[in-house]
């Protein structure tokens, strides 16, 4: 954002979680948030509180930008933000509106490590918030109601292809032919109000997984699971009317109309904990509904869950940790049910296999795990025999009439 942006928008673009110790130095220097250009510039260039430039794979760490490039950008804006075209040149600006768009970043801990979360606004085109889109001096300003257009015409329209949309093509035609731009259902001279929009659900994951959802008609929004998930570039779909898919680093967000039910799937792409959150998005305000934290995940993990728009807080997740068909149920009580012993051992084996250690040490650790598995299996068979003998004794007591048939069935 430019200096002009901060003059128009009072909301901070960066906030710091008070409970995250790694933000303490930042909070001491800039305060709990950044809402001025001077603070913003010193943060992104690393000149306020000095920090090293992160490696290219460390996307959770804030980048360090070159000071001279930031200065050049600010000077460009200072020169042209107030530029007025000659009177004989017609100037028209159009802002896309109604699609969830990132408006701020909150630095916080994620699974115990430094990370960040994103704050969204509905007042943008999925890339640019509307104050940036109409920051110039113009004769005419219009708003393209993308919320309505995506729901009724083309759900994939966003910032990158605005010029291809029919309503924008009509505006261009009117300008070229020196005609007036006519308002319609999608092109407005007055900005729509976020309070007039229906509520949405946000379902998000922060983890090494890919997330997707199906509506009741089979339309899909999310990362297409039917592709090579190890590829560098993955195919994303937004086929559910009124839906939006967003992603940052390892976090993925699916915005959905709060109506009907949605069947979700996620697949593991690595080892680590997964957090699933369900939130309500109303008039630009996000409210937590349910959270499922630190769910164990491996590359073989898959999970499914159904979100009912009327009762999203009752959602339960069915998890297959290792892809072996052994499932467990996770409820929104802040965490998972306890892992079975077999699931825990499999998770440990997967983790050992990914360790960057000497091969001899790795094989020795795996051998010890294998020995433990055999001992557990032997103990399991012994317990099965004990339970079988107990069952026979109970049946004998039933035959003798000392235990009722109903009680025997219940015990069995």
Across the structure, where does each feature detected by a protein language model lie?
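Helical cap/lid subdomain of alpha/beta-hydrolase-fold lipid enzymes
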Residues: 1-187
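Extracellular glycoprotein-like low-complexity segments
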Residues: 183-412
């Amino acid at each position: 954002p430019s200096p002009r942006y901060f003059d128009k928008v009072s909301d901070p673009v960066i906030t710091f979680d008070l409970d995250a110790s790694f933000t303490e130095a930042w909070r001491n220097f800039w305060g709990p948030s950044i809402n001025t250009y001077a603070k913003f510039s010193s943060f992104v260039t690393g000149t306020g509180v000095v920090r090293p430039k992160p490696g290219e794979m460390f996307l959770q760490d804030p980048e360090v930008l070159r000071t001279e490039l930031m200065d050049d950008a600010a000077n460009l804006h200072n020169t042209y933000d107030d530029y007025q075209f000659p009177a004989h040149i017609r100037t028209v600006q159009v802002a896309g509106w109604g699609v969830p768009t990132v408006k701020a970043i909150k630095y916080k801990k994620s699974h115990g490590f430094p990370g960040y979360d994103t704050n969204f606004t509905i007042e943008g085109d999925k890339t640019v918030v509307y104050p940036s889109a109409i920051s110039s001096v113009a004769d005419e300003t219009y708003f393209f109601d993308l919320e309505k257009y995506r729901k009724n015409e083309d759900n994939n329209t966003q910032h990158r292809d605005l010029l291809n949309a029919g309503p924008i093509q009509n505006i261009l035609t009117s300008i070229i032919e020196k005609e007036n731009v006519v308002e319609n259902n999608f092109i407005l001279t007055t900005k729509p109000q976020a309070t007039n929009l229906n509520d949405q659900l946000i379902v998000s994951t922060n983890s090494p997984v890919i997330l997707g959802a199906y509506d009741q008609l089979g339309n899909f929004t999310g990362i297409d699971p039917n592709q090579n998930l190890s590829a560098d570039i993955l195919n994303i779909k937004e086929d559910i009317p009124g839906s939006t898919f967003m992603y940052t680093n390892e976090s993925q967000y699916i915005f959905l109309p709060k109506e009907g039910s949605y069947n979700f799937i996620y697949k593991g792409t690595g080892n680590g904990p997964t957090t699933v959150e369900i939130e309500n998005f109303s008039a630009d305000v996000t409210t937590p509904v349910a959270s499922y934290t630190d769910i164990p995940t491996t590359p073989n993990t898959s999970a499914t869950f159904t979100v009912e728009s009327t009762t999203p807080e009752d959602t339960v997740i069915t998890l297959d940790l290792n892809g072996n068909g052994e499932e467990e149920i996770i409820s929104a009580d802040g965490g998972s049910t306890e892992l079975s012993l077999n699931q825990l051992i499999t998770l440990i084996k997967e983790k050992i296999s990914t360790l960057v250690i000497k091969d001899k040490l790795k094989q020795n650790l795996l051998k010890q795990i294998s020995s433990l598995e055999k001992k557990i299996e032997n103990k399991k068979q012994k317990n099965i025999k004990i339970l079988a003998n107990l069952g026979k004794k109970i049946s004998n007591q039933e035959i003798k009439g000392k235990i009722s048939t109903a009680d025997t069935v219940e015990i069995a």
